[in-house]
């Protein structure tokens, strides 16, 4: 009887381990916003699908997807997304949602921005790419001032925000990260609602022809659900501290 029971446990455990598995390679901001914890349990196949979210900077997420370490890619850098699709690493792409970037800094130092420290993530993330695009349009290369007023953290949004608040400095952040951030100190939003600060998130289904090790059907099923009208409404309704976080067109 004991042998039969052990065989049954092993059989059941084996089936659980080999359930449909989908890995989402994601930017950190969507994970840190709490969106996945809110959204994914609504997926009709949630209980029978093991969904793993790997949250890293956009650059690393794209590299991971190129290496077939995920069936779905959710990032926010149009230039690198276009290159990913052009090189046939993705089969389809969908404009999932958008929010915006903001510039935060100390409340009492509004008139002295030029003499203060700016903290850059400098981590090849989508936020870092957006920041560098803004600097380029302004005609300034801030890296030539690295170590003086321009500080390159090489870290994620949370640690970079902590550095900014502790040093009384400034940084560019996505709005959702700021809403979730607890250590605001005396910092506030200084610049927002500008067209150049729009932050678009794309979702890409990784090309099965390149990554045949992945469970393509499971990834495709989740991808199709995430781009549905039902999910669009769920995304729009998601809030942090009574503030809308993401929008869908």
Predicted segment positions?
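Sec-dependent N-terminal signal peptides
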Residues: 4-13
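Exported/periplasmic ABC-transporter solute-binding proteins
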Residues: 20-47, 59, 63-69, 77-78, ...
